[in-house]
Amino acid sequence: LILLILTIAKIFLSPVSFYTSIKSPVGLSLFSSFPMSLIMISVWMKELFDKANLYFWVAGVVIQTAILIIFTIKYVFNFRIKYVFPSWFMVYAGLGMSAINCKDFGMDIYGKAVYFYTIFISIIMVIPILTRFFKRDTTIAARPLISLLAIPFGIILPAYIGLSPSVSTNSLWLMFMGLQAILVFVIINMILHLFDGFFPTWSCYAVSVAIVAYASKFFLAYLLGHKMGSDIITYIIYGEYVLSFIVGAFMLLASFISILEDPEVHRQRVMENTQKLNLLE
C-alpha cells in the first residue's frame, strides 16, 4: 500500500519524470505492476473501506485495460522484435489478477472469461518472448526481465483454484512444481547478475518471487482444505514468504540508495540505463 501511495505521489508530483519512465515498451509494461497491485489488495481493503473496496478493484481493471490497449496500439500494431520482452506478460496476463478475486465482487462470469483469456494469451506469447530473449543479444539491464516468466503460472494457478468447478489435484501439482522450478531459475539468475550494477529492472526479481509466494499460498490453502497438506510443503511455502520479504527489502534498499545519490549522477545513470534497455525512441 505504501508503494502504491508513493507511485501515485510520483504521478502527480513529477508527471514529466513519470511520462519519461513509461514512454518505452519496457517502462509501460512494468507500470502494469501498479494496477495489478490495486487489484490484489482490493480484497484486503475491505477492512478499511468496507464495500468501497470495489472501487480499488475496478480502478485496477480499468487502468490495466487502458495499458493493454495503449501498448497494443504502440508496440503490436507497429511490431518490432527488438521490443519484445518478458515484461509483456505483465501487460497481457496481468489482467488475470482480476480473475483471482472476482468472486469477492460478484464478477464470476467476467472472471472466467478473463481466466481463459489469460491462459490463451500466455501460451501465444511464450514462444516469441523466449525466442527474442535467448536467440538475440540482450543487454545487462534487460536480463532481470526474464524472471517475469513466473507471471502466467503465478496468476493461472490461484485463478484455477477459485473458478474451476472441479479442480484437478494433479494439474495443481504440475503448476506448483513449475512455479518452484521458475523460482529456482529466478534466484540463480539474480545471484549470477547481482554485481552487474543496479538497474530499475531489478524490481522484476521481487515481483517474480512475490507472485510465486502469492500463488503458493492458494495452493497450500487448497491442500489444507482438502486434508492433503504436509509439513514439508508448508515449510517450503513459508520459506517463500521469507524469501519474498528478503528479496523485496533488498531491491527496495538498492533503489533508495540509487535515488539518494547525487542528483546529477543519478540522472546520468538513469539515462545510461535507459539507453542500455533500448528504450529511447
Residue ranges: model-predicted function:
Residues 14-42, 57-60, 73-100, 115, ...:
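Juxtamembrane helix-loop boundaries in multi-pass membrane proteins
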Residues 117-176:
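Aromatic-anchored, glycine/proline-accented short structural segments
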